């Protein structure tokens, strides 16, 4: 059993090294090509009026974003942990995301207790993971989004809920796999990156369904006894669990 685990870890390490190498080798010519595009656009501003030129620049932006996401995906387990006061940390990130959607009519509810414990986390990466999950909720054609945190006996329970477009259990399972997305310009790496970061913190992330909650009739205006804001008639419910030690 130990030999099998060691072999698997070696394969994963080789995979990450290969992915890092490919990403690095591709990034250099992409950066160079992008520089050429910028020079061409500067010398020939009329190119901006060309639809094909705009399509090319959009594809280049997508390629650069894909390379950035590949790098993040490959480094999700490389964390720099530090003692972090979770109440101000979680409150700040949940409020910061809303600033990106101030012009949206979406109703947003935040529930973060003031006396959460201090945990050893990588604040930059955990912020990246939770921010991405919240952004997904806001971009899901939702009318309401909620972010709630509850301290349990041995963990912090974070729930992100929206009442946007519904997706099936099969789809939600697939979304944790790399390159699976419903977004037109999505890379399909957002959820895998978030899962990798959370698992690097020895935590877990999963979609919940009506039968897995205490009361599927609860709504964002009617939190259940645990403090979770629930609405499962449509949309999605993500639960993130972070251990206290």
Residue ranges of predicted features:
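Conserved DHp (HisKA) dimerization/phosphotransfer helix of two-component histidine kinases, i.e.
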Residues: 50-100
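Conserved micro-motifs of the catalytic ATP-binding
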Residues: 76-79, 118-121, 182
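Conserved catalytic submotifs in the C-terminal HATPase_c
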Residues: 107-117
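Short beta-strand/loop element within the Bergerat-fold HATPase_c
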Residues: 144-154
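Short conserved segment of the HATPase_c
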Residues: 167-178
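Detector for a conserved hydrophobic position within an alpha-helical segment of the HATPase_c
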Residues: 198-199
């Amino acid at each position: 059993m130990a030999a099998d685990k060691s072999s698997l870890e070696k394969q994963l390490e080789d995979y990450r090294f290969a992915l890092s190498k490919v990403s690095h080798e591709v990034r250099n010519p992409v950066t160079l090509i992008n520089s050429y595009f910028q020079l061409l656009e500067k010398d020939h501003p009329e190119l901006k009026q060309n639809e094909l030129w705009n399509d090319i620049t959009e594809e280049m932006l997508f390629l650069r974003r894909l390379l950035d996401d590949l790098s993040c995906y490959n480094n999700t387990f490389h964390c720099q942990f530090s003692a972090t006061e979770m109440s101000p940390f979680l409150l700040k990130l949940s409020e910061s995301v809303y600033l990106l959607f101030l012009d949206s009519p979406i109703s947003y509810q935040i529930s973060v207790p003031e006396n959460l414990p201090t945990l050893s986390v990588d604040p930059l990466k955990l912020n990246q993971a939770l921010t991405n999950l919240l952004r997904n909720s806001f971009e899901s054609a939702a009318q309401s989004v909620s972010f709630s945190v509850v301290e349990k006996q041995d963990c912090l329970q974070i729930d992100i809920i929206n009442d946007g477009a519904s997706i099936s259990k099969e789809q939600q399972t697939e979304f944790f796999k790399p390159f699976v997305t419903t977004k037109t310009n999505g890379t399909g790496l957002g959820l895998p990156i978030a899962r990798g970061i959370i698992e690097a913190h020895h935590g877990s992330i999963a979609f919940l369904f009506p039968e897995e909650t205490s009361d599927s009739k609860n709504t964002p205006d009617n939190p259940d006894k645990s403090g979770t804001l629930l609405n499962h008639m449509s949309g999605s419910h993500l639960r993130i669990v972070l251990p206290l030690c």
